[in-house]
Amino acid sequence: MKKIWLALAGLVLAFSASAAQYEDGKQYTTLEKPVAGAPQVLEFFSFFCPHCYQFEEVLHISDNVKKKLPEGVKMTKYHVNFMGGDLGKDLTQAWAVAMALGVEDKVTVPLFEGVQKTQTIRSASDIRDVFINAGIKGEEYDAAWNSFVVKSLVAQQEKAAADVQLRGVPAMFVNGKYQLNPQGMDTSNMDVFVQQYADTVKYLSEKK
């Protein structure tokens, strides 16, 4: 009996220590107004945002977060249109096309690089070329671009940003209640930071 009790006590201590690693106001903040019906894990980004490029291409935050998510928990990525003027809005619509066609993974890197690295994306036509080079037929892209589904996805992205009162990117929210706070994490080591970021998302996704 004593051994069982000690084992249970050890589990409780382990859980308490794990929970104590995460503090509201440190690794995350609780939203003043929770958003009902928000995606379970929601990341906002812009192809114009240098930090978003770093999160995606250097730190691989999205990939690492997905690996840590509990079974059945889905991650959603939305593009914002408050950067880049009219081209930023075109990129939000293009991201809606990518979501509708299920080709996000094919176009993410070339869109980031075309905007920030090679600066070859300067118009809606240039964006279209990226999709075609990624293997999407021009007719398919054009049909999606003008579709009701894509227009709805654009509105959905804009509404989601307004609902959480988004002020900047990259930003990640969990269950419409919590926002990740990278400034409160260990930035002395890249691998440690990425691990802590992904672990915090996992913790919040399981938080009741």
Swiss-Prot record:
Keywords in alphabetical order: Disulfide bond, Periplasm, Redox-active center, Signal
Tagged with keyword Signal: yes
Location(s), subcellular: Periplasm
GO molecular-function terms, A-Z: protein disulfide isomerase activity; protein-disulfide reductase activity
Biological processes annotated in GO: cellular response to antibiotic
Occurrences of domain Thioredoxin (ranges): 20-150
Disruption phenotype: Induction of the PhoP/PhoQ two-component regulatory system, suppressed by 50 uM CuSO(4).
Signal peptide location: 1-19
SUPFAM superfamilies on file: Thioredoxin-like
GO cellular component: outer membrane-bounded periplasmic space
Pfam family, one: DSBA
Disulfide bonds: C49-C52
Family to which the UniProt record says this protein belongs: Belongs to the thioredoxin family. DsbA subfamily.
Role of this protein: Required for disulfide bond formation in some periplasmic proteins such as PhoA or OmpA. Acts by transferring its disulfide bond to other proteins and is reduced in the process. DsbA is reoxidized by DsbB. Required for pilus biogenesis. PhoP-regulated transcription is redox-sensitive, being activated when the periplasm becomes more reducing (deletion of dsbA/dsbB, treatment with dithiothreitol). MgrB acts between DsbA/DsbB and PhoP/PhoQ in this pathway.
PANTHER family tied to this protein: THIOL:DISULFIDE INTERCHANGE PROTEIN DSBA (PTHR35891:SF2)
Name this protein carries in UniProt: Thiol:disulfide interchange protein DsbA
Organism: Escherichia coli (strain K12)
Gene from which this protein is expressed: dsbA
